[in-house]
Amino acid sequence: MERKRVWRTCLTRSAAAVTGVVFLAAAFVPVVCGAASAADLQPVQLAKPNPDNPAIRLLEKRSSSREFASQPLPVEVLSNLLWAAWGINRPNGHRTAPSANNKQDIDVYAVLPDGAYLYDAKASQLKPVAAGDFRALAGSQPFVKEAPLNLVYVSDYAKLGQSTEEMSAFFSGAHTGLIAENVYIYCASEGLATVVRAMVDKPALAKALKLRPDQHITLSQTVGYPKR
């Protein structure tokens, strides 16, 4: 008899506890889910961009251009451009553009009139890869072979670890976009013209750059002075 009384007491307390949890959870539902619908919200009027903000001024100038002068870029401009794109900006080796889990899978190649080079951010150098004018391989548009510089972005899938092919393509595309936008912003600050492009002869260019099978060209970006 005593055992039944104990079990009955335990069950009663358990039921009360469960009921309390249910009521407590129900009390939080409006907070988590939101009691109101979107129809109850009012538009938020945003302020106009502040022209005194340096970042705003640069973004106002950011644009794509497909007309380039053949004038070469000075070494100082080329150096700053590459650092802005994908340079090391902290003692721990992190870059001017983020990458997922700091994989740093993107390699930046500079295709110049005399040859193709690989940007080495740690050494602050352009390392020769191949001699010759490969600019025409960096795109199908006529201006590509007239501009003094074509940046070619290459993702090293080996650095992305065990990602699936789909995820590797996603990460490499996102990382490339971040770097390319850095180039756009730097070009806006220097009065340079630039345009990012996907129309690239990837097989021929991969051969010229001596890429491995697990290195994939993502995009190309033409840079130069505006054509006057």
What do the predicted segments below correspond to?
Residues M1-R13:
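N-terminal secretory signal peptides that target proteins for export/translocation
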Residues L11-F23:
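Sec-dependent signal peptide hydrophobic core
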Residues V21-A35:
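C-terminal segment of classical bacterial N-terminal signal peptides
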Residues A36-A147:
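N-terminal amphipathic, basic helical "cap/leader" segment at the start of enzyme domains
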Residues P49, V154-D156, G224-P226:
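Generic beta-structure capping elements
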Residues R62, L81, V108, L149-L205:
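Small-aliphatic-rich amphipathic alpha-helix that forms the alpha element of a beta-alpha
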Residues G191, K210-L211:
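Glycine-centered helix-boundary capping/hinge motifs
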Residues L211-R228:
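A glycine-rich helix N-cap at a beta->alpha junction
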